[in-house]
């Protein structure tokens, strides 16, 4: 992703750039499922929902580093984003806003703005790089599913947090280890 679409940063910002890599191999998992099943939007949406859970569960070290950066900024602005700024950035925004006690419906509304602000081409560009084998069959339905956000995707992450950790605050303090800071 970074090599394909590098950020256009000033030298000052390039010195301060930090890469925190997160991936759920979403498109690859869709392609593999399509080999065993039919091209199915409902299934692809389930893959997206699972990806949002994987962002939280498989990358706790990245989230810990992310929050250390936010905490250490001491009031200075921090810019965080992913290639399309909808899935991984959506999870990051959900975590930050939840810790700041932003109302859930406001978090949801902000998240859903991705559908209005991104073209589907921008939204899927990040996923194309996850394919390990160029002969995999990526369908238009996969790409259209990847190019949109649905509240069910974010809700899958929220439900995981509520069921497994009770709250974002508990995830932050106990799972990410900020209760000792």
Regions found by a protein language model. Name each.
Residues 84, 88-89:
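Ser/Thr-glycine-rich phosphate-binding loops at phosphate-binding pockets of nucleotides
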């Amino acid at each position: 992703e970074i090599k394909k679409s590098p950020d256009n940063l000033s030298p000052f910002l390039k010195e301060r750039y930090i890469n925190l890599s997160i991936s759920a191999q979403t498109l690859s998992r869709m392609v593999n499922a399509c080999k065993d099943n039919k091209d199915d939007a409902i299934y692809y949406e389930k893959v997206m929902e699972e990806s949002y859970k994987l962002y939280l569960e498989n990358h706790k070290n990245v989230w810990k580093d992310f929050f250390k950066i936010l905490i250490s900024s001491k009031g200075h602005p921090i810019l965080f984003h992913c290639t399309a700024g909808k899935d991984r950035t959506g999870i990051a925004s959900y975590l930050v806003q939840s810790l700041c006690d932003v109302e859930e419906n406001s978090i949801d509304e902000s998240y859903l703005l991705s559908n209005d602000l991104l073209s589907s081409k921008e939204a899927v560009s990040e996923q194309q790089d996850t394919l390990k084998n160029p002969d995999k069959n990526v369908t238009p339905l996969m790409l259209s599913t990847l190019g949109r956000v649905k509240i069910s995707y974010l809700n899958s992450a929220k439900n995981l947090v509520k069921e497994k950790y009770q709250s974002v605050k508990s995830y932050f303090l106990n799972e990410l280890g900020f209760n000792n800071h």
